[in-house]
């Protein structure tokens, strides 16, 4: 699986696009497009034919996108300060993080929208919407959660009435990037075995304490459970990769259990986890050693609640966690 960053800093996880069974529309605005763009009186940038809204070049509070616009590109209104927006019926596609870090309180998805990039459209907003209306037959809202109509893609929370104990619908195959990011009221999540792909930062900075993971995923993505309230995290058999900062900054995390299938562990996987006292993994694993665990975020000389534990059973003078090895 290959990731890239777009110009707004949003990680785009391309594997999630596999599950778009309707027509994918390009929402990326290239530098060349912006070089030849037309800028209106509000500082909003358009392609020369007026069909693609590319970006904003200054702050604005209220805006009406004109009829004829078919695509709102990745990050187009991100950090714009936008408080309200009206979208046209001509709109077909909404890009990654198009309305992230704005002050929107309401949003209506027009009836002809057939493509929303696999990122929660308000993923980086600290506050959820008071009102979200979806007129498109390609999507639906269930208890404050946006899904594709066929349940294949879980986009995440869009309004405050999302459940504290979340059970993602059976049949979902992909969880969008940033799906439940910054959703402080979330306490637990149950992910069905139909899910095969989770997006980067899917539960980042949420209040989740307990997770039931799908048994059919092969990766814990970057920052997926970073800055949560987890106490125990069991990585399912079949997972091959745990990416950078996947479990970082969980102050209450005590135990992490890795499977035999794990082959790669990223940087800072559990950096900033002061309560971590147990890491369990297979005896023959190539990562259950001091060097790789330090790469993953365990640093020598860090004073914490694990100061009486050891990081390596061959050197009792090192502070850290006890490794539990099993066959």
Go through each PLM region and give its residues.
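Structural signature of tandem-repeat unit edges
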Residues: 1-45, 51, 56-71, 79-93, ...
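Short glycine-/acidic-enriched loop or helix-start segments at secondary-structure transitions
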Residues: 96, 118
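Short, well-ordered secondary-structure "scaffold" segments embedded in the functional core
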Residues: 120-122
